[in-house]
Every structure is written in structure tokens, then in C-alpha cells.
Amino acid sequence: MEPSYDHEHPHHLLTNYNSKKYPHVSRTPEYSHSTGSDYPEHGGYLTDGRLMHESNSDAGIYHVRQGSEHSSPSLHSPAIQSSGYENEHLNEAVLAAHSHSHSPMPMVSSAYVGGGTASGSLINSNIPLLGGGGNSVLNKFLSHPHAGMVGGGTGQMEDCTSHSPIEAASMWSYDYKGDLCAPNCGYLERHKPLPADLKYRPGGTQSKSAKESRIRRPMNAFMVWAKIERKKLADENPDLHNADLSKMLGKKWRSLTPQDRRPYVEEAERLRVIHMTEHPNYKYRPRRRKQSKLRAMQPGGKEQSESSPNPGTGGSKSNPKLATPPLATASSSYTTPTDESTCNSTNQNHGQSTPGGLYEQPLKPTYSPSSVDCYSNADSTEQIESLAANCPPALLNESSPTGGGYDNSLLLKKLTKPSPSRAAKSRQEKLAKSEEKNKGSQSQGQSQQGIYAATYPLAPTSVAVVAARGMYVTCNNRGLLDHGHSVKGTFYPPVSVSEDDNSTSMRNSISALQQHCNVVTSTPSSSGGTMPTSEMSSYTVSMADNCGNLRLSMNELSGNEYLPSANAYGMQYEDFLRYQSNDMDYSTSAVEHKETTSDSASGQKCLKYPDTNQNYDDYEAEAYSNAMLPATAASYYTQLPYPPTSLAAFPLQLAVPFQQTTSGAYGAQPIQSGYLHYGNYGGYEGMAQSQPQNQAPVHHQQASHSAPPSLSVPPNQTVTSNSAAISMQQHHHHHFGPAPGMVGVGVGVGVGVGVGEMLFEQQQRKDDEISNILAGVRKTCYSN
């Protein structure tokens, strides 16, 4: 291999471009411009130092890894184990050269190992990256024996060496990674062993594009420190699992004094500044763990099993990420991508044992670009939680690699509760659709599941709502914490208990709702049936009963693409329910009556949602209540604080009501309850409880439901009619809580507030509304 002078090569161009673009990167001219003469001995290296072997295949594999592992590939670029690569050139040369070419970090000067095949030396372009600290880093970096080789024949090497003497030590053996980007080091370390290489090879190509495009966050001080310390700990305790190392590192870091941490803090700041200069428009987007991990890790499934003895919790526990701070979670994968990612994918697989489980997860974009933007600010934990919310419990567990810093079990608990992923839900809902007839009895059990799912994560959950036409609307439900007061209940998507169960229970609950709606007085009996299932279910039932039509919405939900009735934003959910309910056979209401059990299921669904929404602004609740007081949905709409047209304008939470415009507008649907809102959402657990008790007197139930802040409706409002008052109370409740199927809680039989009716609005309206909803959702997602 003659050193070719292809400075013209894209790679070389890249390096030149980098040097121009990032003058701060101090590449030694020898590196980028060294002529073949510099490397004549290294046939493998191009004059620019780029490895001749740098071929697409090589680069592809390498890139994939590189992109995945570290925010600044350049850091890790210095050396990639040649053994892993088929290319003989690769073997000959340190891979660093090509890394910078694809690496997001232009900073990486093309550091080309100058040595012969043996030269594993990393002369590393990272030196500039490291900046002032670079010298020491270089020293460490170059201290590898191979590094010495690098220096051997090339003047360029001397530049690097000038920073520090090059010692013969295998680059790999050295834990320069502490100095270099942690992710890079972790990456190198992981891939250093052949198995790791093998692991990545299969998955590498799959996730290559994703990983390549991914810009890693700059390491924080802990990561910078942990990079170095982890290597030391690993050498001292070779038998320890990465998760244990992470725990030890976390404790050790916490025990460090500010003085001890200062150098790492400074280095982290320096890296951050560099990162900012390189990626001025960089915006942190939490990794779509489920998707990418699933894809990337599946090939390495064997590793997954290894890394996570217990797929659900083991993965998260063991994730070395634990050691790394949440910030590291995105990049921490570098430390144990195998553990965590494999765990994640494994968990996902396990968690989503449901028919579509595996393929479904990737399908449902946990975070659509917009959703990512929505919570790009969320810290890793939040993102993980949101993922968890969307993912099956197992997934959640894996998702919580961040758990390393945090109590994984805690995260898992939080996240696992809404285990059903949206995709799973949609899939299950479809199944439920088919099974729904058979599931009348199941619905109770399902409702129980709903209970487990009921814990509504405070953490943001991104919800992919399948709008009509199979569109995915992804809104990330930011946790209450995230949204704060601004979107109290809207973003909590009603979480259906389980996919199939959810849909089935939804339908059942809907039917139950219809029963109640049709026979408000029958509510007591209905509630009696539901109560056994659970307070939640009874609560839901009463709600559902109140809005018999609601049952339709629920059915629609379960039956329709509407993916996660539970996951959708409350209002989105409502809207979708409404639309789907239109699709549903309205006549089903009679059937719904039969399905008392389903009532309980819906109740559970409602319960799922904690009554986080109770805090919904009272004024809004009152407004809704007042709107509800009017017998007709139309009046409700007119009274809505936000005109129906302003759907897009007001947050999703409110969006539903306007969509419920006049029943007259829908014409086809009675739209008893102007708002399909999730009147008695699970948010009101108290309501759920009281409802069962009060179900006989619907108004009592409703009142109890309204007991939550949404209860703000004045007595005179209740006067309108028990059902009306109840419905309005529930309605405003629903604002607060995203009860999945509960939307039609408003009993408003006389009042005509029946949510179900609204749901029944004609499909055409549904379609129109959906577009509006989508617009509103998008607005909300992006704005948030």
C-alpha cells in the first residue's frame, strides 16, 4: 500500500475542513498534511495519516460504534482495535484516522497512527481536543507502547510527542479514556475485545446511520472522572460487573471533595465549550432507547442475555450507566452498551412478548422528532421514565439505565407501571378488538391490569397516538413535574390498562358507560358490579356508565387504531375516542349495557391516572362545569373558555371540549356530554372510590368524583340535573385526569352531556377533528 497522497479524499478533506472550520483544533500540520514521505514506512497510512484501509466497510463499522459511543468520536477515534476489523490495513493502522472523518467531532484532527501494523499508537487528534489538558492526555494517550511506535518514524508524531513522551504501552491498556471522551474510551474498551466487535458488527450496520448521526453530549465532570476510574476499578476487580463498578464509582465520586473534583469539572467544562463550538446548534435529544437499542441490540441478543440476567430489572441495575450521571445515560451506553442496550432490547423483547412486541416497539416512535424536541430538556431520568411509561415494564427497566445514578428499582417501579407501550397498546387494542367480544369477562382482569398501569408516571411519557388513517401523533407526555402547572392533566395520556385488556376493557367499560348513560339509575347496580373489580373500575364504571356513549368512545379506542387510549393526551384521547366512537356502532351502546364487567375495566383505566389532574386549574374546571350545566353539548362548547375553533390554540387538555362542539353539529350523535373529557379520570382516585359507593345515585358518584378540585362546580350547577352536574363535574374532572375510557363520565342523561354521544359524532367530524387534534398535538408538542 503506497501512501497515497489523497488529501483529496473525503476523509482528508474532512480533516482539512475541520482544521479550517475549527481553527482551535490544533492539528499538527504533519498530521493532516504530512506527505507520503512522512509515512512512507507506514504503507497503510495515507499521507494525511488516514489509514488506507479506511474503507466504507471499515468506516461503517467503526463509525457506527463511534457515533454510538461517544459524543466526540474524535476522542475515541485515536485508536480502534484493528483486530476487530477485517481490513488488513485496519490492522496495520490505528483507526483513529478515519474516525474523525465521520465523527461528528471535526475536532478530531486526523490523528493517524504512524506506526506499522504494530503501531497501535494513537496519535491522536484528540490532543487539540483536549486542549491545554491535551498534553497530559496525550502523554497518557501516547504512553501506550503503540503510541511509541507512532512516534517512531514520523515527524508528525513528534508534534504529538512533543506534548508528551510516547511510551510503549498498548493504547488499549492505558486508561487514557479518562482523558479522552469517556464515551470514546468506553467505546474503545468495549470494542477492544473481539466479542464486542463481533457484537457490534451484526448490529452495527443496522444502527449505523442512527449512531453516526447522533452527536453525543459532552461528558460531565463525573463522566470524565469515571472514565479514568472505571478502568482502574475494572483492573482491580476484573470479576465485578459493570453495574457494580458503576455503583462503586458513584459512591466514590460523591465522596470526592470539591478540590478533588475540580480538575474534572474544568475538563468537563472545556469539553463542553469544545462541543459547543463544534455543534453550535446542538440540542440534546434523549436517545430513543427503545427503538435504537432494540434494533442495535437484537443482533447482539446473546450479549443482552449476558448483560441482563434478569431482563427486566437486571439490565437497568447492571447498566454501567448507573455509575454515570443521568447526563451520561445517553452516552453512558458507551460504558456498557452491551449491558444496557442489550438489556433494553432484551427487556423490550420480554416486556413486549405481546404479539407485536418486538416489532411494535420500533414502530411506535417513543419520541417522534417533535416529541423529542418536546422534551429535549428532560433529563435522562425523565426521558427514561417517559420511555418506561411507553414501554413494557421490562423495557422500562432497561430504559432506566440512568437508574445507575438513581435507584433503578424506583425508576422501574415508576416506569413499569405503565408498562404497556403505546405500540403494544395499539397492537393489543387491535387484538382486543377481535377478542373484545370474548373479553367481556376478561375486561375485569384487564381492568385490574389497568390498575397496575394506573400509576401514571410523573415522568414524561411520549405518547404516540394513532390518529385516524394510522397516523402516529407523538406527543410526549411530559411528567407533571416537567409540565408543571402549565399542562396539568392534558399531557397525561390515559393509560389503558393493557393493550388487549385495555381495548377490551375499554369497550366493556364503554358499554358499561352506555348502560349507565342509558340507565343512570341503573348505575348503582352497574357500579355494584364494577366495585368488586376495583375502586378504580367502579369509578370508571360510574363515569363510563354516566356516558353510555362514552362506551362507544372507549370501544372506538380499543378497536381503533387510536393507539393508546391510555397513552394519548387526555384531550387527544378524547378527540380520538370521539372520532373512533363515530366509527363504532352507536347501537353498541345496548351491547355495552350488557358488559357491566367492562365498566369495571374502564373504571380501572380511569384509576390508572392518578389524580394529578385534579389540580387542573379550578377556573377551568368551573368553566367546564358551567358549560356542562347547559343541557346540550353545544352550550358546553359555547361556554368553553376556549372556543371550539381554538382547539389548536388551547392545550390539548382543553382541546377535546371544543371538538365536542354541539351535538347538533354532529347531528348523528346525541353528544350528551359536551365534553367527552375524561370527566372522572383516574386522576380522581378518590372519585373512583366514591363512585362505586355513590354509583347508585349517579349524581352522588359524580359529586364525589367532582370532589377533586374539578368538583369546583357550584351546587347550583349540580342543580341543573344530577346527571348534568355530575357530568360536568366529571367532565372537568376529565380535564384533570386523562381517564382512558372514562371520558363520557358525565351522566347527563337528561342533560345530554353524555360524553359517549359526543364520541358518536360522525366519522366525518371525527376525521376533521383528528386533523385539528393532530395540529393541536403538534403545536403542543413543539411548543413544549
From Swiss-Prot:
GO terms for cellular component: nucleus. Residues 278-376, 407-448, 686-719 are annotated as: Disordered. Transmembrane segments: none annotated. Residues 426-439 have a biased composition (Basic and acidic residues). The keyword Iron-sulfur does not apply. Residues 282-293 have a biased composition (Basic residues). Keywords: DNA-binding, Nucleus, Transcription, Transcription regulation. GO terms for biological process: cell differentiation; chaeta development; negative regulation of apoptotic process; negative regulation of cell population proliferation; negative regulation of DNA-templated transcription; negative regulation of transcription by RNA polymerase II; positive regulation of transcription by RNA polymerase II; wing disc development. This is Putative transcription factor SOX-15. The gene is Sox15.
